């Protein structure tokens, strides 16, 4: 049985890691053992942060909705309760955009929420 020399496969494996480590600083970009660890850690961060991004955007939307609601004399929780009672189903992303970019439309929603709370 002939001897198998693995130089080609080893080089291909290394090149794959170096391609993923492109743009890194110091030895992380050109020393295989360090680059491999850096790429693995980057993958862990990416996996974790794809989930955190969803939480962070929801937090941001809630902050913006709360600010817009308080400008119109209502807290976030009362505003959301009023919308639910008025059977207005708009998600937080759209509400946050309205609060920032279309204050008049958002003010109308706040008035409808106030009316639903009073009824």
UniProtKB/Swiss-Prot annotation:
Q: Which GO terms describe its cellular component?
A: ribonucleoprotein complex; ribosome
Per the record's keyword annotation, is Glycoprotein included, yes or no? no
Q: Name one GO biological process term.
A: ribosomal large subunit assembly
Q: Which UniProt keywords apply?
A: Ribonucleoprotein, Ribosomal protein, RNA-binding, rRNA-binding
Coiled-coil stretches noted in the UniProt entry, renumbered to this chain: none
* SUPFAM superfamilies found in the cross-reference section: Ribosomal protein L20
Protein task:
Binds directly to 23S ribosomal RNA and is necessary for the in vitro assembly process of the 50S ribosomal subunit. It is not involved in the protein synthesizing functions of that subunit.
Q: Name the PANTHER family on file.
A: 39S RIBOSOMAL PROTEIN L20
- Could you tell me what this protein is called? Large ribosomal subunit protein bL20
Organism annotation: Neisseria gonorrhoeae (strain ATCC 700825 / FA 1090)
């Amino acid at each position: 049985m002939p001897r198998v020399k693995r130089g080609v496969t080893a080089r291909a494996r290394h090149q794959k890691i170096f391609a993923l480590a492109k743009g890194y600083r110091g030895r992380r970009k050109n020393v295989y053992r360090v680059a491999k660890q850096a790429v693995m850690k980057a993958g862990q961060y990416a996996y974790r942060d794809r989930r955190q991004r969803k939480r962070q955007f929801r937090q941001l939307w809630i902050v913006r909705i709360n600010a817009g609601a308080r400008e119109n004399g209502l807290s976030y929780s009362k505003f959301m309760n009023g919308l639910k009672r008025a059977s207005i189903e708009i998600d937080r992303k759209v509400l946050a955009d309205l609060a920032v970019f279309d204050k008049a439309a958002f003010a109308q929603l706040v008035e409808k929420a106030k009316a639903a709370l009073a009824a």
